[in-house]
From Swiss-Prot:
Protein name: Urease subunit alpha
Subunit: Heterotrimer of UreA (gamma), UreB (beta) and UreC (alpha) subunits. Three heterotrimers associate to form the active enzyme.
Chain positions recorded as Ni(2+) 2 binding sites: 217, 246, 272
Modified how: Carboxylation allows a single lysine to coordinate two nickel ions.
Pathway(s): Nitrogen metabolism; urea degradation; CO(2) and NH(3) from urea (urease route): step 1/1
Keyword Transferase attached: no
Gene: ureC
Assigned keywords, A-Z: Cytoplasm, Hydrolase, Metal-binding, Nickel
């Protein structure tokens, strides 16, 4: 029997069971748990390789064969870290398994035919497209920036650089909802718009959901009072949509307990639950003790570094229309920035008490850094606290990696009722996938696949004789062009809007998909991120304790996935 040494095998077909891969220049290492291939029957494309007629390619039509196969990829998802071929058919994930020609190869469950395209995944990591559930739609250029970072779904609100949008994630009113649905129809991105949820009577909220909102957003700048919270959640319960909330920093209409009481045990997504992005000062962080609260962070506080506190004050003054000449405005800003709660946020993420990470795009957050900041946090926690208990036996960071990737993939999908379509690499879901070379993981993807088509990729000089000559930069690919962008993307709306014939009335090209199962979930549904500690905050010192344990850590002086990768 012919054999190959492990290093040669990895160079030709990628890592296999038991091999370890470093993620970028972080201290996070993942180990291959399973390899779906049959040794000796691997498929690979190229001159003199396997995927040729009568060899790894069968004779069947695309009734049986897949449209696309990504060969020998290392899949990193919330459910595991495995090596395999990934089949894509009709823009959706067909299977993670063994590709090839069943006429001549064993254990083939992804059939390659003459109608099958190939993407070489050897030596690459494949992840689900990211979901950013805290978007201020301030400018359309955010979509390209997010896409090239590995995000394929954006949920939030806004109408452009209006003052309200720059502060709050709300697309206010039926007219603006319709116009934003039309404006984004041909963008290569899944989208969902949140209507304004601040009202004490239901009618104005109901009409927004019927006009295409996928949920509602409560924001303190519009008045997040107990009455508006109760009304908004009551409407959400009736329409099966999620509510996102930015609570009352100034504690004008009540304290954190007043807000939690107004929830009445109904599920809610709490934005920037640490508080620097806004929320009851100084103790909004304790909201994540509650099983009905789905807590997320925004990326400027991810992770805690020696620059974090300093950059936040000016950021906050601009985003919330404050005046540095007004003493009360400065005091308002100061009350939100606390190094103690930011440090605790790192640890709460690492232990799974905070469930999601998002951007807060151009409104105290960076739309292209959700993925990067997530893995920088994982690295910092590994450096400061070592392996998680769940990883001790393996000696690699598999559980930590699965915990952190869930924060920007499956968990926001579950929270907003879209996990039946996106959020993981599982059969039947949209083929929204991101391919990474391990050395560039979490900072520079090598390919972004949207609904089965390549939507964006680094590309060299279009006049060159090969694709790689400089200047190489991210460019839109065919999946971003023409009607394909709409055909490979969806917009999430309420079931009521879908049943109202909204697509036809607005003349939309893309498919509308209803959110569902948003009201029957809890934090226990947040995969790998469901810890419910009893959190307390000292009102004088801002010290944070979880089940009595003081949560504190030092700020990072340097981070991976940073200037090493972004010289230009």
């Amino acid at each position: 029997m012919a054999t190959m040494d492990r290093q040669s095998y990895a160079q030709m077909f990628g890592p296999t069971t038991g091999d370890r891969v470093r993620l970028g220049d972080t201290d996070i290492w993942i180990q291959v748990e399973k390899d779906f291939t049959v040794y000796g029957d691997e498929v690979k494309f190229g001159g003199g390789k396997v995927i040729r007629d009568g060899m790894g390619q069968s004779q069947v039509t695309n009734e049986i064969a897949v449209d696309l196969v990504i060969t020998n990829a290392l899949v990193l998802d919330h459910w595991g870290i495995v090596k395999g071929d990934v089949g894509i058919k009709d823009g959706r994930i067909f299977k993670v398994g063994k590709a090839g020609n069943p006429d001549v190869q064993d254990n083939v469950d992804i059939v390659v035919g003459p109608g099958t395209e190939v993407i070489a995944g050897e030596g690459s990591i494949l992840t689900a497209g990211g979901i950013d559930a805290h978007i201020h739609f301030i400018c359309p250029q955010q979509v390209e920036e997010a896409l090239t970072s590995g995000v394929t779904t954006m949920i939030g609100g806004g109408t452009g650089p209006a003052t309200g949008t720059k502060a709050t994630t709300c697309t206010s009113g039926p007219w603006y909802l319709g116009k934003m649905l039309q404006a984004t129809d041909s963008m290569p991105m899944n989208l969902g718009f949140l209507g304004k949820g601040n009202a004490s009577l239901p009618e104005a909220l109901e009409e927004q959901l019927e006009a295409g909102a996928c949920g509602l957003k409560l924001h303190e700048d519009w008045g997040t009072t107990p009455a508006s919270i109760d009304c908004c959640l009551s409407v959400a319960e009736a329409y099966d949509v999620q509510v996102a909330i930015h609570t009352d920093t100034l504690n004008e209409s009540g304290f954190v307990d007043s807000t939690i009481d107004a929830f009445k045990d109904r599920v809610i997504h709490t934005y920037h639950t640490e508080g620097a992005g806004g929320g009851h000062a100084p103790d909004i962080i304790q909201a994540c003790s509650n099983p009905n609260v789905l807590p997320s962070s925004t990326n400027p506080t991810r992770p805690y570094t020696h620059n974090t506190v300093d950059e936040h004050l000016d950021m906050l003054m601009v985003c919330h229309h404050l005046d540095s000449n007004i003493e009360e405005d400065v005091a308002f800003a100061d009350s939100r920035i606390r190094k103690e709660t930011i440090a605790a946020e790192d640890i709460l993420h690492d232990r799974g008490a905070f469930s999601m990470i998002s951007s807060d795009s151009q409104a105290m957050g960076r739309v292209g850094e959700v993925v990067t900041r997530t893995w920088q946090t994982a690295h910092k926690m590994k450096q400061q606290f070592g392996l998680l208990p769940e990883d001790q036996e393996l000696g690699a960071d598999n559980f930590r990696a699965r915990r952190y990737i869930a924060k920007y993939t499956i968990n926001p999908a579950i929270a907003h009722g879209i996990s039946h379509e996106v959020g993981s690499i599982e059969p039947g879901k949209m083929a929204d996938l991101v391919l990474w070379k391990p050395a560039f993981f979490a900072v520079k993807p090598s390919m972004i696949i949207k609904g089965g088509m390549i939507a964006s990729a680094p590309m060299g000089d279009p006049n060159a004789s090969i694709p790689t000559p400089q200047p190489v930069h991210y460019r839109p690919m065919f999946g971003s062009c023409g009607k394909a962008a709409a055909a490979t993307s969806v917009t999430f709306v309420s079931k009521a809007a879908l049943n109202n014939g909204l697509k036809e009335s607005l003349g939309l090209e893309r498919t509308l998909v209803a959110c569902k199962n948003t009201r029957n979930i809890s934090k226990l549904d947040m995969i790998h991120n469901d810890w419910l500690p009893n959190i307390t905050v000292d009102p004088q010192t801002y010290e944070v304790r979880a089940d009595g344990e003081l949560l504190t850590c030092e700020p990072a002086e340097t981070l991976p996935l940073a200037q090493l990768y972004t010289l230009f």
